[in-house]
Amino acid sequence: MTMSMVEKFFSVNYAQKGELFEGLSIWKEEKYQNLQGTFPVISLSFANVKEKSYETTVQRICQIVTELYNDNRFLLDGDLLSEEEKTYFRSISMDMPEVVATMAIHRLSKFLSQYYGKKVIILLDEYDTPMQEAYVNGFWDELEFFTRSMFNAAFKTNPYLECAIMTGITSVNRDAIFPDLNHLEVITTTSEKYAECFGFTEEEVFASLEEYGLSERKEEVKSWYDGFTFGSKTDIYNPWSIINYLDKKKIGVYWFSEDKVQDREDEKDLQDTVKAALQQINAKKYKASLIEKGIPKEKIRTYGFAFQGKQVLIGNGTVIV
């Protein structure tokens, strides 16, 4: 939701769509109004890149990049691009060589920047989903090299980049994946910066309840949906749950996924346990939703690990079973 909102605020594809933000705090400042719809934006997600081999993973990433190029085929019109650049543009496909694929986002940035006369914003959602699958399925080293090459080209050696936002759900030492991105700022759930930006605050939720004539249900909503802490900011609510509650005006589990619980006997050593933990995180299996669906508490395991590169720091890790 956050990435979609950022795209719609900045993207030239949503120019003259300021009404989407009318009535919101950001629209009270003219300097922010003047930014709406003024940047070329490259938005992509790796959320569905869940392959079992290196070859199919790269092919899926190439497919996503190909769709980006197809969405911007207007760049081929006229004389903006040289014949060599047009040839490169047309070479983008699911089966393109890796050396072409790793430069594709960088070069699309250049083409868009030339067309609009402005640097681009890149939004990459769930950058780490392919890496989780690579670790679980044994092709981490291969994918790490490919990913580092692509990210270095897109996010470091890219003079056409205004700024970028990448989101992920696993905490990995920056030097393991982004050793070349020394200008990267890592924001986690323990960071104070932006602590109120990735969820609804209690004040916002209660104001919404009052606006919808549901102020008498504040305690009920708090007991169900007040479950997140970012930095030192407590009482952060899941936006999707609150939006659905306001729409349906009744309590319900609006944020969950189908879950398969792995038997503890299937975990023969620490490596199996770590893999199970990563799979659980990737599938968004949360304790509250598992209990809600009737899974016995004794079948649910809570994982806590600290990672340094590809090594697990045993002393800082706990496994509660």
Per-region residue spans from a language model:
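Phosphate-binding site recognition
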Residues: M1-E265
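A short, hydrophobic secondary-structure junction motif
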Residues: Q33, S45, Q280-Y286, F307-I314
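Residue-level signal for secondary-structure boundary sites
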Residues: K52, D175, E267, E292, ...
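Mg2+/Mn2+-dependent nuclease catalytic core
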Residues: V136, D141-F146, D266-Y286
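Metal-dependent nuclease catalytic cores in nucleic-acid-processing enzymes
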Residues: M150-T157, Q280-T302
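Active-site proximal loops enriched in glycine and acidic residues that flank catalytic Cys/His/Asp
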Residues: G168, K268, G304-A306
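Domain-level recognition of nuclease-like catalytic cores that cleave nucleotide substrates
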Residues: S289-V321
